[in-house]
Curated annotation (Swiss-Prot):
It is found in: Cytoplasm. The keyword Methyltransferase does not apply. ATP binds at residues 29-32, 86-90, 413, 478-480, 494. Forms a cylinder of 14 subunits composed of two heptameric rings stacked back-to-back. Interacts with the co-chaperonin GroES. This is Chaperonin GroEL. It comes from Lactobacillus johnsonii (strain CNCM I-12250 / La1 / NCC 533). GO terms for cellular component: cell surface; cytoplasm. HAMAP family: CH60. Its EC number is 5.6.1.7. The gene is groEL. Belongs to the chaperonin (HSP60) family.
Amino acid sequence: MAKEIKFSENARHSLLKGVDKLADTVKTTLGPKGRNVVLEKSYGAPDITNDGVTIAKSIELENHFENMGAKLVSEAAQKTNDIAGDGTTTATVLTQAIVREGMKNVTAGANPVGIRRGIETATKAAVDELHKISHKVSTKDEIAQVASVSSASTEVGNLIADAMEKVGHDGVITIEESKGIDTELSVVEGMQFDRGYLSQYMVTDNDKMEADLDNPYILITDKKISNIQDILPLLQEIVQQGKSLLIIADDVDGEALPTLVLNKIRGTFNVVAVKAPGFGDRRKAMLEDIAILTGGTVISSDLGLELKDTKIDQLGKAGKVTVTKDSTTIVEGAGSKEAIAERVDQIKKQIADTTSDFDREKLQERLAKLAGGVAVIKVGAATETELKERKYRIEDALNATRAAVEEGYVAGGGTALVDVMKSIQGTVKGDSEDAETGVKIVMKALGAPVRQIAENAGKDGAVILDHLEHEDPEVGYNAATNKWENMVKAGIIDPTKVTRSALQNAASIAALLLTTEAVVADAPEDDKNQAPAAPNPGMGMGM
């Protein structure tokens, strides 16, 4: 296909138009008085959202050159979302501010490579200063504050704080759609996996149709148990001790299953058999997790272990096990805290190294099950459209809260970026005149989020920013109440990781845009090159 090429000023101008179209759409959502954007879908009702990355991803411009500019800004938002889970609108506003100011200087004759060096120098200094002024998250109230600011809802903030308190900071918190209109939290403690009993005759509670085992032994194996003789010595020892048994195996079939059921019905001993969770390598990893959690050993040919040689001290133990037809929950595993902590660190490293979203999700699930449980926030709303919008907001709030736990928090409402600007202005220098220009561009851009929040609240952004530059650290403009106050004390806080990621990604994409000298895009198809239309049979085709 033929290509169209634009150079220097023409190229940058086309990219800037795309940047502005996307950023002007996204930035209307910033702050407590930001508006919503309606997104058309190919079918069904349109989506209504104020989630920056969702809006950015949905924008596709007709002009190829402008679309490239828009897609680059969208990438800054997407990267921020991937790293911190929030801050996408801030990243978009910062990108636009740096690009606009940079383009003016490049047009006036400044060298874009020098400007880029200055942008990188100033961004590094700003990030270092952000870390210096960051507060660590230590209480449940602080977690609730972060979540409340991100979701614009105290109710959601408290729900997320409750969930984190119950399952720990590493625990998995999933967000599901509720069938009702209320948003509520439920928590599954301990390790749960989606495999139920192999026979309903194993239940101990006929009303609930579930099997409860108190202080059971747990046999963990990746083998199939078909011959009862393989585990008979083990069963005899367990019966002598008057204990119950949970069997987690590849499968239990042949004569083994009916023999176990018969002994259960006769009251010889309490036993429940379930299939091992997962498939392939993931199954092996999950069985190893269960073994570490319960202090047992996986009886596997990979380790040279056979069922018939299994000793009772190779079995795991737990305080309580509950098995339904669909799931097994192990609570109070008897594994050593050191072994569990070591396994948790190992999984965290795998999460950091993986490039697959699916693998990351599965690893996080395993991490949560080892770290203490799974919390489920069920989102309710009156309509499908409202439900989707609430779900987006709660997901953002959850991501923001995790980010705050990781790197701490700073004053919200764009105040921290202006505080950083005040601290480093005059101390950060470029190594040339053009680099110095790059430093000044970043300094000016740091005030862009505050300006936009004020404008979305119907105020003059320049006036608010000027006032803020003369205020004490952490004192900012609360757009929700139209007051000047200490943002941290008022509970208006942003995760440091979110603010940092937004600035770093904005500076990175903006610097690339400014140093662009040529843009190549598909040439628009000419009408004369298109195939002629088929003749209409109803026009002059009669005999």
